[in-house]
Design a protein with these regions (language model features):
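DNA-contacting surface of Y-family translesion DNA polymerases
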Residues: 7, 180, 188-332, 339-355
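Extracellular/lumenal ectodomain signal focusing on beta-strand-rich modules
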Residues: 104, 332-334
Length: 356
């Protein structure tokens, strides 16, 4: 059996994060960016994309295409907290994960997929687990290597799962427009089309190789091999944790601050114990609450010093809850520590600074 690689991508990540805490925006065109008309957008949700709005587009142009566009300035601490929850969720399955960015990664599931009767069951389980724990949807590409997994995850968005086998390149990959090939820049696309390369299949064709290499020089060869299905399946992953999470779904609703504080005390102790077991300390604490209508709020706070102490975690978490609590009845709570570092390294750094 060859390798099985998942590419997992959070759909319209920043925009989806904002829809989580502003459910009234769901179904409406929304983009992340400054309200300064001369600035550019970071991202846009799928409703905005249907209107022609996309990332890196100037705000004035986006508003001319979509006057009803909702503009929100980015809250990157909030996005990082949700990203940490996403990666913590995935690490329950395997540590063989290579982050590609804040909202996507590659996962080598070659070994763990053998535990499932049907290979796609693992993909469905991960998709549902991420949704349950973060409120965010993911698309998953399943393939024997990194490039094909990345291409597969882009084929069905949002919330799709796509398998791309080597035997399916001719029917699934090669008919796609060359502009959709990962690794081909926007400026290169028109140059390729000038020499007759319209599709990924044209790019993979042996008869076009010479003229592609004349245009793209050395970079063209590796991309041609990828289009033919030949790409590395080796991931560059580290067993170093970036975050640690604990969560619980409760059988009875949480309506009062006292109840919430009691629950978060239990989670603070559990999180502290996990951090101490792994000899980790962190500097970014986030709390997530989900109500009966599946509306999720996530709040985070950065610390001045690394910690794994339950009383500090509890104090920060209760402050975050108190300033954002609504008595709507919460069923789910999660507590995350991110920006982790080995506790011994922190001691070494302090000792070094004292020596200076």
């Amino acid at each position: 059996m060859g390798r099985v690689i998942f590419h997992i991508d959070l759909n319209a990540f920043y925009a989806s994060c904002e829809e989580l805490r502003h459910p009234e925006y769901k179904g409406k065109p929304l983009a992340i960016g400054s309200k300064d008309r001369r600035s550019v957008l970071s991202t846009a949700n799928y409703e905005a994309r249907k209107k022609g709005v996309h990332s890196a587009m100037p705000v004035y142009q986006a508003l001319s295409l979509c006057p009803e566009l909702i503009l929100i300035e980015g809250d990157f601490n909030y996005y990082r907290a949700l990203s940490a929850r996403f990666f913590s969720c995935l690490k329950k399955y395997t540590f063989k994960i290579e982050p590609a960015s804040i909202d996507e990664c590659y996962m080598d599931v070659t070994e763990i997929i053998k535990q499932y009767k049907r290979p796609l069951d693992l993909a469905f389980q991960i998709q549902q687990s991420v949704l349950n724990e973060t409120g965010l949807s993911v698309s998953i590409g399943v393939a024997p290597n990194r490039f094909l997994a990345k291409m597969a995850s882009d084929m069905r968005k949002p919330a799709g799962i796509t398998v791309l086998r080597i035997s399916e390149l001719e029917t699934k990959l090669w008919p796609l427009d060359i502009s959709l090939m990962y690794g081909i820049g926007k400026k290169t696309v028109p140059e390729l089309k000038k020499i007759g390369i319209q599709t990924i299949g044209d790019f993979a064709s042996a008869e076009n190789e010479t003229k592609i290499l004349q245009l793209m020089k050395n970079s063209g060869y590796a991309l041609i091999q990828k289009a033919r299905g030949h790409s590395s399946s080796q991931l560059h992953y580290s067993y170093t944790q970036k975050s640690c999470s604990v969560s619980k779904t409760y059988s009875s609703n949480i309506y009062t601050l006292k109840e919430a504080f009691d629950k978060v005390k239990e989670l603070s102790i559990e999180l502290s114990n996990r951090l101490k077991k792994d000899n980790q300390k962190g500097k970014l604490i986030s709390i997530s609450l989900r109500d009966l209508n599946f509306h999720t709020i996530v709040r985070s706070q950065s610390l001045n010093q690394y910690t794994n102490q339950p009383q500090i975690i509890y104090e920060i978490a209760t402050n975050l809850i108190e300033s954002n609590f609504e008595s709507n009845g919460y069923r789910y709570m999660a507590l995350t520590m991110a920006s982790l570092q080995n506790a011994n390294q922190i001691v070494d750094q302090i000792s070094f600074l004292l020596f200076l």
